[in-house]
């Protein structure tokens, strides 16, 4: 697990009232497979972090709270946090519960492993070709021209992306996937959108 951390005001730990078995609706989401990869010991660690952040005991956290998640000593930031909230917020209430957070956390862990594996020259950055390979490893099959376009949006000069930038790119891809699935409840692989719905998707991404 990459160096995550969060240091809000200390809140006395309490036992959360839910089990680690997520609701049925959550199990229908593409990111449920991420949740199933997590060992129970890791779930307890994630639960502890979640409880510290959820200071008002609402059972959910917002992008304003998630932005302080540290990645190698660097906070996630509000832009990426907001995008990730949208990816994993399957009930679209603008916040994420513990199950959604755990899947999000595993998503970041997996992406970091892919980033390291594809940073073959140990520069701390990866280029468009390496990003293309990392996305395939992460389960996202995108044409290379699309990957290159996303890469140049974040790095117009063509310089390699840092992990936080790579995570932002992957969050965009994952959000697009979530928005597609929400409009494809029968999982046919095809969606029919009117212009207003397309505008909504563009606004969210």
From Swiss-Prot:
Keyword Disulfide bond: no
GO cellular component: cytoplasm; membrane; nucleus
One example GO MF annotation: calcium-dependent protein binding
Keyword Calcium: yes
InterPro entries associated with the record: EF-hand-dom_pair, EF_Hand_1_Ca_BS, EF_hand_dom, Peflin/Sorcin_CaBP
Protein topology in the membrane: Peripheral membrane protein
PANTHER family xref list: GH27120P, PEFLIN
Binding site for Ca(2+) 2: 89, 91, 93, 95, 100
UniProt record similarity statement: Belongs to the Peflin/Sorcin family.
Subcellular location: Cytoplasm; Membrane
Domain EF-hand: 45-75, 76-111, 119-141
Keyword annotations of the record: Calcium, Cytoplasm, Membrane, Metal-binding, Repeat
Record lineage: Eukaryota, Amoebozoa, Evosea, Eumycetozoa, Dictyostelia
Biological processes annotated in GO: sorocarp development
Annotated knockout phenotype: Cells lacking pefB and mutants lacking both pefA and pefB grow normally in axenic medium or on bacterial lawns, and have no major differentiation defect, apart from the fact that mutants lacking pefB have a stalk base thicker than normal.
A Pfam family per the record: EF-hand_7
Major localization class: cytoplasm
Superkingdom of origin organism: Eukaryota
Positions annotated to bind Ca(2+) 1: 54, 56, 58, 60, 65
Name of the protein in question: Penta-EF hand domain-containing protein 2
Disulfide bonds: none
Subunit structure: In contrast to pefA, does not form homodimers in presence of Ca(2+). May form heterodimers with pefA.
Transmembrane segments: none
